[in-house]
Amino acid sequence: MKRNIIFVFLLTAAASVFAQSGKKEIIKKGWNFGPLPVVGFNSDLGFQYGACVDIFNYGDGSRYPAYNYKMNVEVSTYTKGSSTFRFYGDYNDIFPKTKLFVDVAYFIDKKFGFYGFNGYCGVFEKDIAVFKNNESFYVDHNSKSAFNYLCRKQIRAVVSVKRPFPSCNRFFYAFGLGYFNNAFDRLDVSGYDDQLSLYELYRDADLIRDDEKYGNVTQLKAGLIFDSRDHENDPCSGTYVEAVVTGAPDLIDGHGYNFMTATAVFSQYYSFLKNHFTFAYRLGAQNVIAGDVPFHAMMNTNILFYKKLTTDALGGSNSLRGINPNGVIGKGYAWLNAELRCRIYDFQFVRQNWIIGLNPFFDAGLVTQTFRADEQKRAWQTLCEKYTVAGVDDYVYSSKDESLHTALGCGLKLIMNHNLVVSVDAAKALDKRDGDELKLYVGFNYIF
């Protein structure tokens, strides 16, 4: 039965593809605007409302679908306080042969996911509420859980540039500057006031130090890039490789957290049936190669040019869809995304070129370099020395080895002029330790 359903789906998709109209694509020139409302609901955070707009300039149209520059503004908030304020600009024509990327953002996330260190070495317990009564812990399985949440506020400012090597328009050298201010605290949502979170247990066990709950990070980046993609935002064929070394000297806080990371991303795109289908995959890895990284800086993937709203890793909409957000964190990690991008139907509306697409996908990742693993093993004993925890399981260390985290899903895309991509992805983890619910993500752009 399942095979028949898959066959009918593929047959329908193929029929839709070849039934597309043969209208000549409109060549865009000058300014182009893509405004969209931001609307959502979360039972804890309330209603989400706001607006987002993509602004393009195509110049005389000779480079279409490439643009001279693109700007994006998003302002959205929930009625209970979580908010996003972001501007980014992608400029290809301000300086000769130079791409300039600017990103400035402020995030208030009052329900930020935290599932512990080192992937499956941490413990995932659904729907538990942990309370502290005087010097004792006790667990209630009937209360709504706040165990895997905390409050995070982040300020981000990034500038990156890339230029081609002489006589070679596929190879680039790149540099970047970054600044991050991260502040973590206990969950700040009404209805959970008396509960203890995993973050607080980590703080009590000193797995997260007192000087790591907030901090500033300055970044100096240098990288090499190879790019043979036919389109930057909606590629059908080509290869993209980015290798970056990021130095983070402690210039502001004086806490002594100086560190360096190495990040590599390799993406390829293979098209067939006249670009109506594209098989795409991305391999990525990041490791700390020198120094001591603090907790507040550990979850950031240090690439030069951003596709998604956040760069948190691993788990969630920008890395491992279907996996608990920030569910796979360590000093080093690796991941894979593989997709079959099906362009089901193309049409023209309000003088814009549109494509409707589907993209079934598979995501996988794991921690390759652990963070305070020995301390994590001893953390529960540290808590037992401070509190009475009789009858309460170890919620810090699972005694399990890390292994591959995997998820399957499918996305729906609405693409305008090969550049503005409205994305809806649904995905589910294949292991219940990564979450047992179907997760839905609404946003912009392919993840790679």
Language model regions located:
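Short loop/turn motifs that connect adjacent beta-strands in outer-membrane beta-barrel proteins
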Residues: Q20-N32, G59-N68, I94-L100, P166-F172, ...
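C-terminal outer-membrane beta-barrel translocator/porin domains of Gram-negative envelope proteins
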Residues: L220-G223, H231-Q352, T368-T370, D394
